[in-house]
């Protein structure tokens, strides 16, 4: 049957309330904080936090990050890099002498991928890498692909 008494109330009148005579429910029997993860709390760590301790894999000495820096941009996002008012002017322009030049390195991209469509408007795109598909679509639109270091 449910009772209105909490469990602590049941211990009243029994001196140490279930916490012993010597220790008296003091101090830190399991250590402080996260102590003992590799020792007396190991079963808990192994069960609930597998892989918390230890290392995996190999280290890469003298790694030069710029060899692996290759942020990509799809063709469908290429025109969004041009400010809106200039974009409208380029797309509606009939003057073939004025074409946009998009240099991707200062914008934080190094490779152009071929996903998506671009309008049949010539443009110059400068980047370190181009996929074959991206290069094909840009040149078909009348544009130029420029590789930069």
From Swiss-Prot:
GO terms for cellular component: cytosolic large ribosomal subunit; nucleus. The lineage of its organism: Eukaryota, Fungi, Dikarya, Ascomycota, Pezizomycotina. Belongs to the universal ribosomal protein uL15 family. Coiled coil: none annotated. It comes from Blumeria hordei (Barley powdery mildew). One of its GO terms (biological process) is translation. Residues 1-14, 21-30 have a biased composition (Basic residues). InterPro entries: Ribosomal_uL15, Ribosomal_uL15/eL18, Ribosomal_uL15/eL18_sf, Ribosomal_uL15_CS. This is Large ribosomal subunit protein uL15. GO terms for molecular function: RNA binding; structural constituent of ribosome. It comes from the Eukaryota. The keyword Nucleotide-binding does not apply. Keywords: Ribonucleoprotein, Ribosomal protein. Residues 1-42 are annotated as: Disordered.
